[in-house]
């Protein structure tokens, strides 16, 4: 079984997260796919950023939703990088992408781009929110979806199935073999996040995971040889 390695917000352990520089480095590092996060700007652009506000990762302050794309462009997202929009990432790298959305509104905006650019084969959509997963699947037939969870109950596999997700992305610190086996029995894949040490990588392989999200290029290099 192949083990997929996803670059977390590019390779945020060595580059400014969710920037074109980080995504290009992730692709050059041989990541199987690149994970990123999307929020809608005030004027409806799909801004690539993890947090709901810009404070942590830029030299600005305030919510993304309160700023236009032009205002977001003025901010430094690290080492002179600007906040990209999703369409720019599509042009900057050719890797498969896993795009995390935070709500139904973002699902609808992303659905438009996926349909217009025929990206069903390249873009996988993930969310912590069941309703966002359900909505993107409704809007884009055939799109691959991922339900993410940091903490979960005994119903997490049933939740993923109900939302139409093909994959569960679960916190490696809380993952058990029982959950992985339940998911696999229902033909769901399981990705562990975030795998940043050799011990965590060995755990991911011992749990028979289908892949892992990592901040560091070296996890991709060593992951190919870890049994």
Residue ranges and their predicted role:
Residues 1-227:
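Phosphate-group recognition and catalysis centered on beta-loop-alpha active-site segments
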């Amino acid at each position: 079984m192949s083990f997929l390695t996803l670059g977390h917000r590019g390779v945020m352990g060595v580059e400014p997260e969710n920037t074109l520089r980080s995504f290009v480095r992730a692709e050059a590092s041989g990541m199987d796919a690149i994970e990123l996060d999307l929020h809608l700007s005030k004027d409806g652009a799909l801004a690539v950023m993890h947090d709901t506000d810009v404070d942590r990762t830029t030299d600005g302050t305030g919510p993304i939703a309160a700023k236009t794309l032009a205002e977001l462009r003025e901010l430094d997202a690290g080492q002179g990088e600007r906040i990209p929009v999703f369409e720019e990432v599509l042009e900057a790298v050719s890797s498969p992408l896993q795009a995390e959305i935070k709500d139904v509104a973002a699902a609808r905006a992303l659905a438009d781009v996926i349909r217009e650019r025929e990206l069903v084969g390249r873009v996988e959509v993930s969310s912590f929110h069941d309703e966002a997963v359900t909505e993107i699947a409704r809007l884009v037939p055939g799109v691959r979806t991922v339900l993410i969870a940091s903490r979960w109950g005994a119903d997490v596999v049933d939740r993923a199935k109900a939302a139409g997700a093909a994959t569960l992305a679960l916190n490696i610190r809380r993952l058990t073999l029982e959950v992985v086996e339940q998911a696999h029995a229902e033909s769901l894949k399981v990705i562990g996040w975030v795998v940043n040490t050799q011990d965590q990588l060995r755990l991911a392989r011992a749990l028979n995971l289908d892949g892992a999200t990592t901040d560091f290029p070296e996890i991709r290099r060593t992951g190919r040889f870890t049994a």
